[in-house]
Amino acid sequence: MKGIFEKLKRRIDILLYKLGIRPLSIETLKELKESRKEREVLEFYDVYMEPEEFVDIEKYEFILYEGDIVGKTAESLSKIFKGNLFPSRNELRYMGVKDEVAYFKKVVIYMIITFLALLFMGLLDNNLLQGFVNGLIGAGIILVLSLFYPKIRLILFKGEIKLQILFTLIYMISILRAGASLPEVLESISKSREYGVVAFEAKSIIRDVNIGGYNLVEALERAKMRTRIPILKKLYDQMIVGYNKGNLPLLLGKLYEDIVRESMVKLDSSKFMIQNLGNLAFGVGLILPFTGMILSTMIGNQGFSGILSTINLLLLKIGPLLTLIFGIFVKLKIE
């Protein structure tokens, strides 16, 4: 009986590994190694040789690697949606994601969890078919949302990127005026996480110079072609011109002033629009529906419970949703 349970546990571990949910444990890998040895049958004319002992158990992971369902599915999804519909690899790295396959691997795992959860809920309600349909719909919603999530996050991330670039410009101007060269400044920025996206870009530029064999101007041109952030393109333009012609601190100072001035102008021009939209949104979205529902409740003689239901709907559902949408709009307009 103990052997049956051990085999069942091993099969469950292998299934979870194939689904990409958890890695194989050292014990399971050792068991796979031993079972593989047992299956090797010697012919009578073979010369017996002691099997090679691997110190690193992880070398046996190739036995099951080909069956990684989640990995293959994620790879297929990344090939389908890669391009204009989906952010570039660099933009994903800004978000802390290694690449498209790693992102879609997480998406597939969430889809599987959602499907199984809704299927289980349908099973509890004695309606397996409805649970299966709900699971498919839920997994589909997760997939659709996953396509738009990175771009929405990058749009909301614009203001933080602008602040990171402004702090980087202040640092670069002060260090360059102190006598440091541009390669030394980029090396220093790449070692500090405080500069966020700019630190990542500086690492890419240094890698192009040290490993790719490009000179600094060519590496800056490549970085300019890779990025989709307009402010970074302006920064690279100024760095290229300043490195070739000289007086880089002055050019970076002008860029800093332009970014701040543009942000202030945008903020001033958006004040009137944000104020009017706020009055319209909360007036039409909250006050008018609240008044109408209260009147209909009183006319329909629904009593105090009807008034509480109306307040619950407006304050706990419509209100927070409206506030979230308005907050996103304000953030986009300001940044």
Swiss-Prot record:
The UniProt entry lists membrane topology as: Multi-pass membrane protein
Q: Name one GO cellular component term.
A: plasma membrane
TM regions (residue ranges): 104-124, 128-148, 280-300, 310-330
Q: Name one Pfam family in it.
A: T2SSF
Q: Which domain of life is it from?
A: Archaea
Which key words are in the record? Cell membrane, Membrane, Transmembrane, Transmembrane helix
Q: Can the keyword Membrane be found in this entry's annotation? A: yes
State its location(s): Cell membrane
Q: What is this protein called?
A: Uncharacterized protein MJ0780
Species this chain originates from? Methanocaldococcus jannaschii (strain ATCC 43067 / DSM 2661 / JAL-1 / JCM 10045 / NBRC 100440) (Methanococcus jannaschii)
